[in-house]
Amino acid sequence: MKENNNLEKLDPIATLETKFAKSSYFIADEIKDEKINAISTGSIHIDQITGINGIPVGKITEIYGNESSGKTTIALQTIAECQKTGGTVVLLDLEGSFDINYAKSLKVDLTKLIITQPQTGEQAFDMIETLIKTNSIDLIVIDSVAAMLPESEYQANMNEALMGAHARLMSKGLRKIQPLINKSKTAIIFINQLREKINTFFGNPEMTTGGKALKFYASLRIETKKADLIKEGINKIGIKTKVTTVKNKLAPPLQTCFIDIFFGSGFDYNNEIIDFAIQYGVLKKNGSWFYFNDNKIGQGREQLKNTLSKNNELFIQISEKTLEFVNNEKSNWQ
């Protein structure tokens, strides 16, 4: 094919600089491989399966699942952990279901938690945009996607059919805030629910509310499923929840763990320490007996837990050794 000598080859960079600002482009190798900052969920198990040590900063996270599967507990524990490091948190309580007593039991600092209750989804997204632009909010939690009522639906009467209004709201709102989030130091959690698909005979009969936009924009999607009840005799004292990273753009996805959530107190941190102490060999097991530094400290897991609950000094020793292993592994996650 003959070259057309009349066509002048233009320098693409010079052309961009002439027509647009210098900031309109960059060279690929100028991108810094920055470490992803994260806010701990308060659960070592969940932090581990995210691969980044918790909820990512500057990204959107969706936590979804059926009723009473641990979604709110994970969000509240994350709020508490964020506050522990001096972070500022805003909760958009669209459901109007914030439980002060439960939040307090999970060590949420109510004196520093900002709560707002927008009436519509549009108002909620306007608030999110405004909060991100302040550059002073570390975590925003939206509870929940299902309660983000579109303005059109808010003003309509009960007889009007407004198909797809919720999905359009989510698509427009997320498209608007996504560029702001990426440049911010704010982590955003959307709590979502599952509902049944109509006339589904094959595949998963459940889907999240709000259409497909949140699935697309979320960097991390965490699913919670109630796996079992935790009982003490005949009394039901908690639930065992299966947690799965269904989508993860920051680390390997489809990682799973099981966590214990106790009614009124949330995660069992001590139990998680025991799990990891056994995993890393801090606690050794011979038969039914558990050993620490070659000393018997409990026969069976329940006796072990009782021993550690009564001997705080021993628990601290085991915790410190265990967390050394956990923290070393965390550096490899990121």
From Swiss-Prot:
One of its GO terms (cellular component) is cytosol. It is found in: Cytoplasm. It comes from the Bacteria. Its main location: cytoplasm. One of its GO terms (biological process) is DNA repair. GO terms for molecular function: ATP binding; ATP hydrolysis activity; ATP-dependent DNA damage sensor activity; damaged DNA binding; single-stranded DNA binding. ATP binds at residues 65-72. Keywords: ATP-binding, Cytoplasm, DNA damage, DNA recombination, DNA repair, DNA-binding, Nucleotide-binding, SOS response. It holds the Pfam family RecA_C. Disulfide bonds: none annotated. Can catalyze the hydrolysis of ATP in the presence of single-stranded DNA, the ATP-dependent uptake of single-stranded DNA by duplex DNA, and the ATP-dependent hybridization of homologous single-stranded DNAs. It interacts with LexA causing its activation and leading to its autocatalytic cleavage. HAMAP family: RecA (MF_00268). Belongs to the RecA family. PANTHER family: MITOCHONDRIAL DNA REPAIR PROTEIN RECA HOMOLOG-RELATED (PTHR45900:SF1), RECA (PTHR45900). This is Protein RecA. It comes from Ureaplasma parvum serovar 3 (strain ATCC 700970).
